Amino acid sequence: MRAADVIQAIGRGFNPDKTYTFFDDDLIMLEIIDLSQTASTSKELLRLKGRIIGKGGKTREIIESLIGVKMSVYGKTVSAIGHPDQILIVRTAMDMLISGATHGAVYSFLEKKKQDLMRSQLDSY
């Protein structure tokens, strides 16, 4: 991860101390999803952020723990830090939540993708 990405990640709400640890891995990337492009009103933006965060942060925590990324919901954006294959999964999960998919369907998708990630990691050895 480049210095510019680390600075941008801090600006998107990530903890600076934890973000600096990403300097070590060149494959780590930052993905920023702008919710204002989807939400037409501030009320809809709040609803989307609520769906992504979940009750008590549950949905965000599930995504982070299953896929192994770090996420931040800040302002009008959702940001994720991870490897490209992880980011692709998070992006799809965010699109599902934004489109109105049930949380259960998103969790099932994430469980399946976690198994796929584990399989691909085992295959690479």
How would you label these PLM feature ranges?
Residues M1-Y125:
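RNA-contacting regions in translation and RNA-metabolism proteins
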